[in-house]
Regions:
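Compositionally biased linear targeting/interaction segments
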Residues: 1-303
Length: 303
């Protein structure tokens, strides 16, 4: 009995040691893949390849196999700049930016929630992430959330992930599934410059909201469907030109022809264990210059 216990203990210890070594190895591989992803994006940006990276082409078209000693590893890129930045509705002091909150409501309404529901959720999100305790007309502050069966307080800070919206009053599972593909979490009080070359007609609400609802959704969808195979060129003015601009909407920085954020997804698999890392890489816009940098990373998996 004693020998059996010793054998079991040793076997368990060996397995744990092997698992820990495998986990450490895979985490090192994830770090190496991160450096490789940055290098690939930097080369693509400097070589002009990002101008032709559409939603399904160029850099975003193929999965890249990575060399590893055991198991398998892959890297895939996707545009991450066809989204509304939820954190843009507050400034650096945690105060609500009224114009951006209004645009957020316009977006939600255009996605299909309707004008009233869109405005209500925009109010609720603003109350959840701003620092004060003043309640927006259709919002909710701590006095609401602390009265729930499972009480909690508002974040009072920018969100790190769009998934945090599920905790907010009015954001049901069904509503979240509808709006999440249009949203992202980036820097406070900063709008994401939308990559027009990565848009599909389904994403017309982004342009609609960014331009304060100036042009009908159907016109925007029609223009997106006319995106040339090589993308809009020589610059974004070719995209805006058919609309005209009688209301004098400031179009500067609303959209561009290259991604300003790129998602890089690393998947490592070995001995029925896996590590998945999702990076958001910030790419300096146009002539801004500078190197791509990791804006955020999420590491997960079954190791």
């Amino acid at each position: 009995f004693v020998m059996l216990s010793i054998t079991t203990t040793v076997t368990t210890g060996v397995r744990r040691g092997a698992n820990e070594r495998l986990r450490t190895e895979m985490l090192w591989q994830a770090q190496a893949a991160e450096r490789l992803a940055l290098s690939i994006v930097e080369r693509a940006a400097s070589g002009g390849a990002l101008k032709t990276a559409s939603s399904e082409g160029g850099l975003f078209k193929q999965q890249i196999a990575l060399p590893v000693e055991r198991g398998a590893a892959s890297l895939r890129f996707a545009d991450a700049s066809r989204c509304f930045n939820v954190n843009s509705i507050i400034d650096g002091d945690g105060k609500i930016v009224a114009d951006e909150k209004t645009r957020f409501g316009l977006l939600l309404g255009a996605i299909g929630l309707g004008e009233n529901k869109g405005a209500a959720i925009a109010d609720a999100v603003a109350d959840f992430i701003d620092r004060d305790s003043s309640q927006e007309s259709q919002g909710a502050e701590d006095n609401f959330y602390t009265g729930l069966t499972t009480p909690f307080r508002t974040a009072g800070a920018p969100i790190a992930s769009v998934s945090e919206l599920r905790a907010i009053d009015g954001v049901t599972k069904e509503i979240y599934a509808r709006i999440a593909p249009f949203l992202c979490a980036r820097e406070v009080n900063k709008r994401v410059e939308i990559n027009a070359n990565a848009l599909t007609p389904d994403f017309a609400p982004l342009i609609y909201a960014a331009t304060d609802g100036t042009w009908p959704l159907e016109e925007i969808r029609a223009q997106i469907s006319k995106t040339p195979p090589g993308g809009w060129s020589p610059d974004i003015s070719a995209f805006w030109q058919p609309f005209g601009n009688p209301q004098g909407v400031n179009l500067a920085g609303l959209a561009g022809t290259e991604p300003t954020f790129i998602e890089a997804r690393v998947l490592l698999e070995a001995e029925q264990r896996f590590v998945e890392e999702t990076l958001i890489i910030k790419v300096p816009a146009g002539a801004a210059g500078g190197e791509p940098k990791v804006f955020s990373r999420v590491l997960g998996g079954g190791v």
